[in-house]
């Protein structure tokens, strides 16, 4: 019986990972088609990142990392190299910050705090990625706006 239970858990995990990836792709695609007045060019709500956060909490860091990398690859296929790279940079830093806070902080922060910190880290990761692409720190002038909007989007 334990062998069958292990196979069930593995099958369940693979199926759930596939469903979460499909949901992340759908949300990413929908988010790319939305036109929200007042948002700066390239600014999105981060709906697909909610799926990665869910995976981190309920499936663990390994599955969340795989989902985050697959999501960035999807963005690369749909929107190009630059968008995929920025998605990867933001996603990895966001995941790292949420992982550190959730698994290594003695006082468990609330989901709200984790979401806000993850959104801020995502924007910082994207700004750092843009600095690498542009080979200059000029993109950091965008930081105050990105951080304020990241704070709002994380809520």
Residue ranges and their predicted role:
Residues 4, 15, 19-21, 26, ...:
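Short helix-perturbing small/polar motifs within transmembrane alpha-helices
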Residues 9-20, 45, 49, 64, ...:
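Residue-level signature of transmembrane alpha-helical entry/exit and packing/kink sites
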Residues 28-45, 69-98, 111, 133-138, ...:
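Interfacial aromatic-anchored transmembrane helix boundaries in multi-pass membrane proteins
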Residues 41, 84-88, 104-155:
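Membrane-embedded alpha-helical hairpins and interfacial helices in multi-pass inner-membrane proteins
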Residues 45-61, 97-102:
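Generic transmembrane alpha-helix motif of multi-pass integral membrane proteins
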Residues 50-53, 72, 76, 95, ...:
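Hydrophobic transmembrane alpha-helices of multi-pass small-molecule transporters
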């Amino acid at each position: 019986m334990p062998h069958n239970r292990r196979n069930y858990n593995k099958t369940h995990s693979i199926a759930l990972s596939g469903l979460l990836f499909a949901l992340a792709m759908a949300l990413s695609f929908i988010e790319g088609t939305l036109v929200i007045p007042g948002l700066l060019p390239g600014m999105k709500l981060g709906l697909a990142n909610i799926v990665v956060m869910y995976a981190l909490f309920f499936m663990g860091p390994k599955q969340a990392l795989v989902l985050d990398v697959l999501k960035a690859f999807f963005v690369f296929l749909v929107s190009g190299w630059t968008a995929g790279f920025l998605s990867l940079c933001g996603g990895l830093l966001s995941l790292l910050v949420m992982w550190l806070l959730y698994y290594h902080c003695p006082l468990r922060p609330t989901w709200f705090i984790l979401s806000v910190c993850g959104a801020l880290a995502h924007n910082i990761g994207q700004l750092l990625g843009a600095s690498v692409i542009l080979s200059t720190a000029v993109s950091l002038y965008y930081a105050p706006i990105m951080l304020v909007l990241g704070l709002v989007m994380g809520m």
